[in-house]
Curated annotation (Swiss-Prot):
Its EC number is 4.1.1.97. It catalyses: 5-hydroxy-2-oxo-4-ureido-2,5-dihydro-1H-imidazole-5-carboxylate + H(+) = (S)-allantoin + CO2. Pfam families: OHCU_decarbox. Substrate binds at P71, S83, E84, A85, E86, Q87, F118, V119, M120, A121, V122. This is 2-oxo-4-hydroxy-4-carboxy-5-ureidoimidazoline decarboxylase. Keywords: Decarboxylase, Lyase, Oxidoreductase, Plasmid, Purine metabolism. It comes from Haloferax volcanii (strain ATCC 29605 / DSM 3757 / JCM 8879 / NBRC 14742 / NCIMB 2012 / VKM B-1768 / DS2). SUPFAM superfamilies: UraD-Like (SSF158694). Residues 70-79 have a biased composition (Basic and acidic residues). Catalyzes the stereoselective decarboxylation of 2-oxo-4-hydroxy-4-carboxy-5-ureidoimidazoline (OHCU) to (S)-allantoin. Pathway: Purine metabolism; urate degradation; (S)-allantoin from urate: step 3/3. The active site is at H70. Belongs to the OHCU decarboxylase family.
């Protein structure tokens, strides 16, 4: 996706808006669909807030679907270009066999406990820090971890959104 200016975003038709921002939240174009009615945006932060509000105002089931749309970290599966780049920046695409097995075990434990994959904004992190966060967060209460995971999703979306805009 090429960089956009805010002026261009405000002129997009509804379908083009969803095409441009439908993957900001992993496999969840409904977020962009709900946020588009808030146009025109006076700033990128206003767009970010509209998208975040769309998630926060959604039902818990819809939020759970959003969390479940994220790939397991360190998995060697097909994922969106954005997820692939984020995981590569954290060296999760080149784990040793031992690290890979550790991530598989942690992912399985976490998913069994919470019913959704571990979500973390991993851009420019490292495998050891990510594994430590997984081990720490698996001890959270269900409500604390659900909130933490949603906050991480918002951070990921914010980073992705920033990449879409050129300086005006």
């Amino acid at each position: 996706m090429h960089e956009l200016t805010l002026q261009q975003v405000n002129r997009l038709d509804d379908d083009s808006f969803v095409d441009a921002f439908g993957e900001i939240y992993e496999h969840s174009p409904w977020v962009a669909e709900r946020a588009r009615s808030s146009r025109p945006f006076s700033s990128v932060d206003e767009l970010r807030s509209a998208m975040k509000r769309a998630v926060e105002d959604a039902s818990r089931e819809k939020q759970l679907q959003l969390l479940r749309a994220h790939p397991d970290l360190g998995e060697r599966t097909e994922m969106t270009d954005a997820s692939e780049a984020e995981q590569a920046s954290a060296e999760l695409d080149s784990l040793s066999r031992s690290q890979y097995e550790t991530f598989q075990r942690l992912n399985e434990t976490y998913r069994e406990r919470f019913g959704f994959p571990f979500v973390m904004a991993v851009k420019d992190e490292n495998p050891d820090a990510i594994a430590a966060a997984m081990e720490r967060r698996v001890d959270h209460s269900e409500s604390t971890e659900f909130r933490t995971a949603l906050d991480e999703v918002h951070t990921i979306a914010e980073l992705r959104l920033a990449e879409r805009f050129s300086s005006e």
